[in-house]
Amino acid sequence: MVKINGEDVDAAGVVLGKYLDDNGYNRLTIAVERNYEIVTKDKYDDVTIEDGDVIDVVSFVGGG
């Protein structure tokens, strides 16, 4: 089991980029932290989510 944004998710073995795409995240407007380390955008398709990972996806919102 994996914890993503505080929720238990069965995503072990899934490539991070695929998870983000499948769940509607816009890669241009998010930052991803995996096990307390930032994952750079160029690595999203190289990282496989592993059992026990803790992932936070943060979206940037503009406004004025």
Predicted regions and their residues:
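Ubiquitin-like/PB1-type beta-grasp interaction modules and other compact soluble beta-rich domains
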Residues: 1-63
